[in-house]
Amino acid sequence: MVRQSGSELSDQSDTDISADSDTSASEGSARHSARGRHRDSRQKGDSSSRGQFLERVVRINRVAKVVKGGRKFSFSALVVVGDGDGTVGVGYGKAREVPLAISKGIESARKNFFTVPRVASTIPHPVQGEAASGVVLLRPAAPGTGVIAGGPVRAVLECAGVRDVLSKSLGSSNSINVVYATLDALKHLEDPASVARRRGLDYYHVVPKRIVRAVNSVGASSDTA
């Protein structure tokens, strides 16, 4: 039987420990890189899905329910979602956490999509919408005017793809009422082509003349450039 000295045993144990540590380190780095790849792919997927629609969180409200053991908090989120090209919807989500409430609001908004009639980058005619005590007036504007509106109204119009419009809030300043009043106004818009067919008129007799002139002047300037 061959006896090994204490120094030889310690050298062998040190070698085994270093090999085990190298193996565990390599496995840990592999797991870390795999998690990193998974996280990167997940982030890329989220960014591509967000790129298809515009999402605006108008309001987040915290609600406290008093129970025997204390208070339970929950959150509600009012979210506007649209493609920026004539389609928009509004949703309301409730949950115990803010991100979950926002995601529920987004899903609810996508179920309530509707199409907004437009002429170039504005609305075809003046319109007024009401919801509870909220009243919102919208007027068409010439190209280049921009969205002249407050926060809740602006969120709805930008998601709907209306880039030139004048607005005025005449009633309640509550953001929920203002958003739904804006939606009511957009739902009362009529497509100029269908109105022209119904009245037996030409399309350009239905659209406001100043909007037609502004659109034609913008088109002529772009052709010249």
Curated annotation (Swiss-Prot):
The keyword RNA-binding applies. Residues 1-50 are annotated as: Disordered. Keywords: Ribonucleoprotein, Ribosomal protein, RNA-binding, rRNA-binding. Residues 53-116 form the S5 DRBM domain. GO terms for biological process: translation. GO terms for cellular component: small ribosomal subunit. Coiled coil: none annotated. It comes from the Bacteria. The keyword rRNA-binding applies. SUPFAM superfamilies: dsRNA-binding domain-like, Ribosomal protein S5 domain 2-like. Pfam families: Ribosomal_S5, Ribosomal_S5_C. Part of the 30S ribosomal subunit. Contacts proteins S4 and S8. With S4 and S12 plays an important role in translational accuracy. Located at the back of the 30S subunit body where it stabilizes the conformation of the head with respect to the body. PANTHER family: MITOCHONDRIAL RIBOSOMAL PROTEIN S5. Belongs to the universal ribosomal protein uS5 family. The N-terminal domain interacts with the head of the 30S subunit; the C-terminal domain interacts with the body and contacts protein S4. The interaction surface between S4 and S5 is involved in control of translational fidelity. This is Small ribosomal subunit protein uS5. It comes from Tropheryma whipplei (strain Twist) (Whipple's bacillus). The lineage of its organism: Bacteria, Bacillati, Actinomycetota, Actinomycetes, Micrococcales. The gene is rpsE.
